[in-house]
């Protein structure tokens, strides 16, 4: 029965992903063991996502959790699981995610409090910030991650996320103008991703003046450990460089530097003080070492991909208490994450609207690049407005539509359903 419980957890995970990506989807829990049953399944209509989430919440609570016990060794943190990773902790996290989507704050707190009992105090001692880097496989903080392994002559099960999250490789271990030791020399020169300016930027103002551009001072990671370097006549502004003294002090321009910067943002070789070209010229980072794969061969990324971790659950508790208008508990859980990051706590209560914004921004900082942000923005009903407002690319802006909050069900599946399945939001948007 524990194996059946794990299967229920995996089913819930798949439907969590489906409802996050497609919204309402066909839902069934029966065995598809005949051609007739397959034909029936193909013609199922969309089931409202909130109904799917509630049914799976109940299923996990009643039919999965009871089979994960101390006696059978399965009531444990994911890092302590001997032969599986999709057990008790993941079940609790999925229940909490389902409840948050359905705005059932008390319902979400039940599994979140169980996770807190299981994982204990959230702090640097128990959960080192350095271990949020994906190169650390199944650390204590993990709740669920995709398992990878790759070696030239052994197991080869890998992804390629690191190849688009590392700075552009110029060859011979030089990444965007900076030699990086320990990351190999064979990674292809892929077009790497970069967050928009809302996430992190330190760009000097136009002209021969050492002042910050006022249009970019509301970045989520602010300040960055960057300082003015030399005036560039072509750019008509100062270039910037890593400030090693500020990094060592943990403070720059009178403000604390978020400890997450060194892992989540790629500014250059922080130890050597060598700055990436894109950072030097434009004041923006690449994705950071959190995503980089040591000794990567070609694009074979052997890191595990972190899907859920304890910091996420802590911030979910803050969100629940905020919606229940409990300011004291909201700030307590929010500040657990901020304390580990080494930034000042939120102590001045100015209203639940401000607290809501603080939680949303903290989730962006803490969980950036961990496959959750779009789901959060859609869940909060602000995906289109926020994405449109902060997208730097004018061409991309022209193609964005509110219906893009969800993917359309593919035409092939709509046809197989006899067009019981449709994409009404896309049709209403003229697509």
Q: Where are each of the predicted segments found?
A:
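An aromatic- and glycine-enriched ligand-binding surface/loop that stacks and positions planar moieties
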Residues: 29, 57, 61-68, 85-270
């Amino acid at each position: 029965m524990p194996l059946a419980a794990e299967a229920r957890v995996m089913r819930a995970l798949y439907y969590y992903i489906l409802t996050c990506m497609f919204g309402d989807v066909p839902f069934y829990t029966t065995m598809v063991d005949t051609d007739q049953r397959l034909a029936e399944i193909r013609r199922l209509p969309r089931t409202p996502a909130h109904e799917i989430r509630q049914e799976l919440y109940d299923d996990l609570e009643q039919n999965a959790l009871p089979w994960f016990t101390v006696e059978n060794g399965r009531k444990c943190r994911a890092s302590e699981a001997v032969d599986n990773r999709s057990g008790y902790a993941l079940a609790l996290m999925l229940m909490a995610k389902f409840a948050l989507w359905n705005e059932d704050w008390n319902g979400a707190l039940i599994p979140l409090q169980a996770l807190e009992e299981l994982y204990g105090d959230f702090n640097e001692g128990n959960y080192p910030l350095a271990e949020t880097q994906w190169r650390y496989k199944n650390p204590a903080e993990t709740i669920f991650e995709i398992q990878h392994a790759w070696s030239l002559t052994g197991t080869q099960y890998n992804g390629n996320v690191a190849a688009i999250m590392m700075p552009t490789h110029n060859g011979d271990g030089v990444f965007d103008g900076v030699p990086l030791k320990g990351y190999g020399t064979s990674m292809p020169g892929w077009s790497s991703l970069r967050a928009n300016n809302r996430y992190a930027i330190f760009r000097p103002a136009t002209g021969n003046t050492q002042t910050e551009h006022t249009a970019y001072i509301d970045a989520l990671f602010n300040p960055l450990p960057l300082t003015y370097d030399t005036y560039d006549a072509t750019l008509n502004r100062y270039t910037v460089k890593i400030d090693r003294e500020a990094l060592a002090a943990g403070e720059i321009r009178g403000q604390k530097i978020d400890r997450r910067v060194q892992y989540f943002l790629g500014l250059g070789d922080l130890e050597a003080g060598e700055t990436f070209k894109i950072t030097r010229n434009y004041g923006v980072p690449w994705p950071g070492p959190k995503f980089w794969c040591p000794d990567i061969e070609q694009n074979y990324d052997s890191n595990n991909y972190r899907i859920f971790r304890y910091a996420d659950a802590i911030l979910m508790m803050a969100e629940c208490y905020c919606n229940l208008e409990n300011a004291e508990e909201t700030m307590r859980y929010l500040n657990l994450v901020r304390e580990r990051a080494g930034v000042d706590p939120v102590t001045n209560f100015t209203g639940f609207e401000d607290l809501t914004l603080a939680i949303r921004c903290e989730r962006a900082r803490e969980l950036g690049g961990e496959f959750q942000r779009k789901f959060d923005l859609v869940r909060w009903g602000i995906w289109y407005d926020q994405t449109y407002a902060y997208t730097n690319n004018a061409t991309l802006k022209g193609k964005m539509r509110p219906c893009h909050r969800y993917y359309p069900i593919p035409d092939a599946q709509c046809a197989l359903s006899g067009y019981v399945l449709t994409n009404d939001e896309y049709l209403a948007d003229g697509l």
